[in-house]
Amino acid sequence: MAKVHVRKKDTVMIISGKDKGKTGEVLAVMPKVSKVLVSGINIVSKHQKPNKQNMEGGIIRKEAAIYSSKVMLYCEKCKSVTRISHKILEDGTKVRVCKKCGETL
């Protein structure tokens, strides 16, 4: 199981692939397969058979998971992608900090 560098509700930017340069919010993290689900990124068409919940069926467009190595954390303050460092505050809590501007994430 690989450690994933992003968490749920983080804002990330895609750094490679067909959606390169787009930003989105992390909806789910799957550390066992080292993948993340990002809103509005990697949209795929799924052919759905009619069933009791969806009587019509048809083609449904939804997000698919992408590898976590293709995303980087996006800092709102410096408006760019960044790596993170960890810092321990005076009260003993551990926080994530932007390496470029020093803002807590």
Swiss-Prot record:
Gene3D superfamilies: 2.30.30.30. Keywords: Ribonucleoprotein, Ribosomal protein, RNA-binding, rRNA-binding. Signal peptide: none annotated. GO terms for biological process: translation. GO terms for molecular function: rRNA binding; structural constituent of ribosome. GO terms for cellular component: ribonucleoprotein complex; ribosome. Pfam families: KOW, ribosomal_L24. InterPro entries: KOW, Rib_uL2_dom2, Ribosomal_uL24, Ribosomal_uL24_KOW, Translation_prot_SH3-like_sf. Part of the 50S ribosomal subunit. Belongs to the universal ribosomal protein uL24 family. One of two assembly initiator proteins, it binds directly to the 5'-end of the 23S rRNA, where it nucleates assembly of the 50S subunit. This is Large ribosomal subunit protein uL24. It comes from Clostridium kluyveri (strain ATCC 8527 / DSM 555 / NBRC 12016 / NCIMB 10680 / K1). The lineage of its organism: Bacteria, Bacillati, Bacillota, Clostridia, Eubacteriales.
